[in-house]
Swiss-Prot record:
Family from the record: Belongs to the lyase 1 family. Argininosuccinate lyase subfamily.
Protein EC: 4.3.2.1
Gene designation: argH
Name by which UniProt lists this protein: Argininosuccinate lyase
Keywords attached to this entry: Amino-acid biosynthesis, Arginine biosynthesis, Cytoplasm, Lyase
Length: 472
């Protein structure tokens, strides 16, 4: 005899044996997909209104369905809704309770749709909302970088390649570089949003439906500018989730790189920056410690987001057409990535607002390590010496300085001219870090005029631009 609980399952008609309890627990997703309730209800209300409009159900039934769904949403939001361990997923939990509340009319809600297109809709509605929120968090972080750049417009520090001192740069230039990365991240997310913002509902299980549904009407109700074109692709497509996870991975990579610099710069060996006590922790045994745990955790959580991307891609790579239950496993990586990215963007914006830079130490380090050696080579080029020859001359001068324990600016004119007779007294101006920075006036360079122009364009909304700009 058929188990009574099996009769309550919407798909239980052809089954003669009850579902094994282990299978019930193993296949249930209600513990994590319940966060989709708002979007499931929003989609169901739009679907019910379409069914009424198309005269597939009557107005009285449609009204009861819509009001019942609104009551369920209120109960979930107030915490009075009871999820059952037997609920497979958020769709079944809501439908079962709707039928309990309004009777047979509730059983008509699923007319003309499948959980396959229903869940695709829920995820798209969810991700559409979350991308908008992430973009707002990115806007705040970009604003924090901009304000800090304006504040540090004259601060000079050593720029690094291979983590070795390379050339002096403005701190503002460095900070705007991170903002530039976030601009690209924002562009990718907005592009991803376009592919998320497509209505899947109406694809049904995989082949569409024979019922006279109106997908365009549902799209208008849910503010989707586009409707999916192939029902088989629609129910199997999770490209948009993978694309979001990839865009999120790049966001996290950029945040991680910045945090790596902060971790190094806040060490006693660098002493370039002090992170506020509010964003650091101490040691349980070493009283002197002030650890950059927030920055370290952002760096660590980046690997977590990468893992979510790889998990989804691995999940998708072997799926036959069309829908497969494997796709249930797309949600936890997605939800975790959304939560992680939002948390990291939010806390990093607050942390950088409260950082203090050691300007004196930065300049002191910029003046060492032969950071103006390239300026000397370019000086020789301006004197008519081919660059490769100039490069060799300066390399020998640097070796001589290391041997003599001097900086380039400390060499006498006699010492300079021993290596190259065209060098004269005007070389000393070229070797100051201030003049070095000032001379980097090519478009996008670190000269103050270029950096301030970039700030101006950002503030006036004219950045970035594809127009060719005259270099000043």
């Amino acid at each position: 005899m058929k188990d009574s609980t099996e009769k309550s399952k919407p798909w239980g008609g052809r089954f003669q044996e009850p579902t094994n309890e282990l299978v019930e627990a193993f296949t249930a997703s209600i513990s994590f997909d319940r966060r989709l309730y708002r979007y499931d209800i929003e989609g169901s209300i739009a679907h019910a209104r379409m069914l009424v409009r198309q005269e597939i159900i009557n107005r009285k039934e449609g009204f009861a369905i819509v009001e019942g769904l609104k009551e369920i949403q209120r109960d979930i939001e107030t915490g009075s809704f009871e999820f059952s361990p037997g609920d497979e997923d958020i769709h079944m939990a809501i439908e079962k309770d709707l039928i309990r509340r309004i009777g047979d009319a509730g059983a008509k809600l699923h007319t003309g749709r499948s959980r396959n297109d229903q869940v695709a809709l829920d995820v798209r509605l969810y991700l559409r909302a979350e991308i908008k929120e992430i973009l707002e968090f990115m806007k705040v972080l970009k604003g924090a970088f901009l304000e800090l750049a304006k504040k540090e417009a004259e601060t000079i520090l050593p720029g690094y390649t291979h983590l070795q001192k390379a050339q002096p740069v403005l701190l503002a230039h460095y900070l705007l570089a991170w903002r530039e990365m976030l601009d690209r991240d924002e562009s990718r997310l907005r592009d991803c949003y376009r592919r998320v913002n497509v209505l899947p509902l109406g694809a049904a299980a995989l082949a569409g439906t024979s019922l006279p549904i109106d997908r365009a009407y549902v799209a208008r109700l849910l503010k989707f500018p586009e409707i999916s074109r192939n029902s088989m692709d629609t129910v199997s497509d999770r490209d948009f989730v993978a694309e979001f996870l990839f865009a999120s991975s790049l966001i996290m990579m950029h945040l991680s790189r910045f945090c790596e610099d902060l971790i190094l710069w806040s060490s006693g060996e660098f002493n370039f920056v002090e992170i506020s006590d509010a964003f650091t922790t101490g040691s349980s045994i070493m009283p002197q410690k002030k650890n950059p745990d927030v920055a370290e955790l952002i760096r660590g959580k980046t690997g977590r987001v990468y893992g979510n991307l790889i998990a989804l891609l691995t999940l998708l790579k072997g799926l036959p057409m069309t829908y497969n239950r494997d796709l249930q496993e797309d949600k936890e990586p997605l939800f975790d990535t959304v939560d992680t990215v939002k948390a990291c963007l939010q806390i990093l914006a607050e942390m950088i607002r409260n950082m203090k830079f050691n300007r004196e130490k930065m300049r002191q380090e910029a003046e060492g390590g032969f950071s103006t050696a390239t300026d000397l080579a370019e000086y020789l080029v301006m004197k008519g010496i081919p660059f490769r020859e100039a490069h060799g001359i300066v390399g020998k001068l640097v070796s001589f300085c290391i041997e003599c324990k001097k900086e380039l600016a400390q060499l006498s004119m006699e010492e300079f001219q021993r290596f190259c007779p065209v060098i004269n007294e005007d070389i000393h101006d070229r070797l100051s870090v201030s003049n070095s920075v000032r001379s980097r006036k090519s478009y996008g360079g670190t000269a103050c005029r270029q950096v301030m122009e970039q700030i101006r364009q950002i503030e006036e909304g004219a950045y970035p631009s594809t127009r060719r700009r005259k270099e000043a």
